């Protein structure tokens, strides 16, 4: 299990990540009110928001997409890429809804592929993207470090190395709405400094 449920009124919303489904369950009877099925496995917990007095659920999947669905019916509102423009990370933390924006944490995939002796380690890094809550349109993105370049070093197997890389964002961002700032914590360095 990767996700935590959200309870609103008498409904428990749960992201069954490996099955690619979101369930709306009645907390008194345990019966399903509706089930949403995505085209891929899901990765995050669910963020709940009452945008324009219409309750929505926001979450990510295993291929880097953000889903926004109607919390009352489970109907899809939109799906859009949560990836940064370099499209090299993956989404592991839960998106955050603040005002009319969805803030998306982007981690790195170099941690997974770094064990391959033929991989040109490492070229990706963490990022944060912001999407419009109503449309899914990309509003802005922030990268935790500059794009990696070849360092002139080679691995023990003769493969070119890149850097800097790393600083993935594995967790959920925190938003200071009063100051209009997003705070994230970053993970490990994945290449030589």
Indicate where each model-derived feature is located.
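Short beta-strand segments at enzyme active-site cores
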Residues: 24, 140-142, 183-184
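A generic secondary-structure signal for well-formed alpha-helical elements
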Residues: 73, 106, 132-135, 146, ...
């Amino acid at each position: 299990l990767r996700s935590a449920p959200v309870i609103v009124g008498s409904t428990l919303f749960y992201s069954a990540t490996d099955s690619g489904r979101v369930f709306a369950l009645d907390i008194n009877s345990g019966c399903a009110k509706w089930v949403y099925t995505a085209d891929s496995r899901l990765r995050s917990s669910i963020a709940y928001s009452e945008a324009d007095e219409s309750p929505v659920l926001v979450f990510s999947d295993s291929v880097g997409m953000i889903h926004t669905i109607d919390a009352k019916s489970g109907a899809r509102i939109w799906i859009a890429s949560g990836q940064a423009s370099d499209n090299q990370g993956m989404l592991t933390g839960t998106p955050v809804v603040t005002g009319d924006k969805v803030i998306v944490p982007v981690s790195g995939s170099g941690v997974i592929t770094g064990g391959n002796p033929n991989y040109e380690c490492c070229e990706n890094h963490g990022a944060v993207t912001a999407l419009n809550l109503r449309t899914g349109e990309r509003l802005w993105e922030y990268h935790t470090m500059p794009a990696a370049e070849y360092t002139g070093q080679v691995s023990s197997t003769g493969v070119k190395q890149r850097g800097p890389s790393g600083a993935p964002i594995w967790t959920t961002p925190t938003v200071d709405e009063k100051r209009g700032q997003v705070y994230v914590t970053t993970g490990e360095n994945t290449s030589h400094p």
